[in-house]
Design a protein with these regions (language model features):
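Acidic catalytic/metal-coordinating carboxylates
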Residues: 42-46, 69-73
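Non-catalytic signal-transmission and effector/linker regions of two-component phosphorelay proteins
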Residues: 1-13, 117-127
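Charged docking surfaces used in two-component/phosphorelay signaling
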Residues: 25-33
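Hydrophobic/aromatic residues positioned on beta-strands within the core alpha/beta folds
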Residues: 89-91
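Active-site beta3 strand of CheY-like receiver
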Residues: 54-60, 87
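The feature encodes the CheY-like receiver
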Residues: 24, 66
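Short hydrophobic/Thr-rich beta-strand motif most characteristic of the beta2 strand and flanking loop
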Residues: 35-42, 50, 112
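The short loop immediately C-terminal to the conserved phospho-acceptor aspartate in CheY-like receiver
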Residues: 20, 63-64
Length: 127
């Protein structure tokens, strides 16, 4: 009898949300080239809409976006998918106030400063 081939482990799925489409697309390309299955969306609302169909292992989101902020998207993601890891990034000083409000509400998120160097991002995802 022959043994069934070992199942190929699936690539970790990463949902990238940023209203700057070039940044979202670039990060998704880098992740796809480095062993992840990544999808780019351009708003917090689209990130939430994509959860059921994409089933990400991780959400990477800009904090300051038009409409729903990255923190709001992260909180909604945690409620819907408690095992989904969250990593936020921002290039704006106003982020501190939003993060403090989230902490007061019981939410802790890791945040990286923009611009995010690809090697730093990959290290965070793999570490």
């Amino acid at each position: 009898m022959s043994e069934a081939p070992a199942a190929t482990p699936s690539k970790p799925r990463v949902l990238v949300a940023d209203d700057e489409q070039v940044i979202a697309n670039t990060l998704a390309i880098i992740l796809n080239q480095n062993g992840f299955e990544a999808r780019a969306v351009y708003s917090g609302e689209k990130a939430i809409e994509s959860l059921d169909s994409f089933q990400p292992d991780m959400l990477i989101s800009d904090v300051i976006m038009t409409g729903m902020t990255g923190i709001e998207a992260a909180i909604a993601t945690q409620k819907k998918m408690p095992n989904c890891k969250i990593l936020l990034f921002s290039g704006q000083a106003a982020t501190a106030d939003l993060l403090e409000k989230a902490r007061q509400d019981g939410h802790e998120f890791e945040i990286l400063a923009k611009p995010v160097h690809p090697s730093d991002l990959l290290a965070k995802l793999r570490g």
